[in-house]
Amino acid sequence: MLLAIPSKGRLQEPTLRLLEAVGIKPLASDERALVLPTSWNDVNIIKARPEDIPYLVDSGRIWAGITGHDYIIESGSNVVEVLDLEFGKGKLVVAVPKTSGIKSIDELPPGARVATKFVNIAYNYFAELGKRVRIVRVAGSVEILPQLGIADAILDVMATGTTLEIHGLTPIATVLETSARLIVHPNYVNHELTKKLVTFIKGYYAAQGRKMIFLNVPATKLEDVLSILPAMEAPSVTKLAKGDVYEVFSVVPEDILPDLVMKLKNAGAKDIVVTSIEKLIS
């Protein structure tokens, strides 16, 4: 089945890193190839413009895709957002030149020219406000248009605000917040492949910021150690074959490890081993 991913832009690299982290690795190295087999034999990757991905998934010919929430809303496509992937975060904002003196969306004058590639979002947003504006459709480099006298304002994605600052622009309204989403066609929401992909992505995110800790504990110190050691439910405890010693292991938050290890050591734990977790699947 085909999974559409961004072929360019701010979502491309994070998407590839996420897929590799969950075990979906492209098997073809030719960057010109648009369809690539992967290490999951039931998934092929198709590369497409992020703004086109909602339409491709809506067509039913593509099982799933990764793209921005802003592109999904702009397209009006009949797709299901099954996961917020927590990268590519930004805000779709209306911004004006700092020199305009405009401080809020209410001060934007009637007939103002608003440049954007999010035409449908812009029309709907200003219609809901009851404001009459002229939408100037552009494909890119929208920030420069006010300087060129082609637009009075822009509607575009702001991640850090640096690009707006460079071009002398300031945001006056937030239209929506966006981030990368995993989308599927409605017919595939309950498909086993969708469930598998969602499980592995959630497992990868759940493992972030956690470590697995193993330790050996004499029987006389076991109660003291267990009273210190956090766990998702309860630490696992196994008696070793030799001696009156137990092996204990647990999943713990990474940020408490330095203090936790010293407390465990002082409580009588020894042979402490800390390892990374690739995925944590509940």
Swiss-Prot record:
Q: Where in the cell is it found?
A: Cytoplasm
Q: Tell whether Acetylation is among the UniProt keywords.
A: no
What is catalyzed by this enzyme? 1-(5-phospho-beta-D-ribosyl)-ATP + diphosphate = 5-phospho-alpha-D-ribose 1-diphosphate + ATP
Check the record and name the Gene3D superfamilies matching this protein.
3.30.70.120, Periplasmic binding protein-like II
Do you know which PROSITE patterns this protein is assigned to? Answer: ATP_P_PHORIBOSYLTR (PS01316)
Instruction: Tell me a GO cellular component.
Output: cytoplasm
Kindly list the GO molecular function terms attached to this UniProt entry: ATP binding; ATP phosphoribosyltransferase activity; magnesium ion binding
Q: Which UniProt keywords apply?
A: Amino-acid biosynthesis, ATP-binding, Cytoplasm, Glycosyltransferase, Histidine biosynthesis, Magnesium, Metal-binding, Nucleotide-binding, Transferase
Q: What is its main location?
A: cytoplasm
The activity regulation comment is:
Feedback inhibited by histidine.
Task: Give the enzyme class.
Answer: transferase
Keyword Translocase carried by entry: no
UniProt-listed InterPro entries: ATP-PRT_HisG_long, ATP_PRibTrfase_cat, ATP_PRibTrfase_CS, ATP_PRibTrfase_HisG, HisG_C, N-reg_PII-like_a/b, N-reg_PII/ATP_PRibTrfase_C
* Role of this protein: Catalyzes the condensation of ATP and 5-phosphoribose 1-diphosphate to form N'-(5'-phosphoribosyl)-ATP (PR-ATP). Has a crucial role in the pathway because the rate of histidine biosynthesis seems to be controlled primarily by regulation of HisG enzymatic activity.
In terms of HAMAP family, this protein maps to: HisG_Long (MF_00079)
Q: Which PANTHER family would you find in this protein's record?
A: ATP PHOSPHORIBOSYLTRANSFERASE, ATP PHOSPHORIBOSYLTRANSFERASE ATP-PRTASE
Question: To which protein family does this belong?
Answer: Belongs to the ATP phosphoribosyltransferase family. Long subfamily.
User: What protein am I looking at?
Assistant: ATP phosphoribosyltransferase
| Gene name of the record | hisG
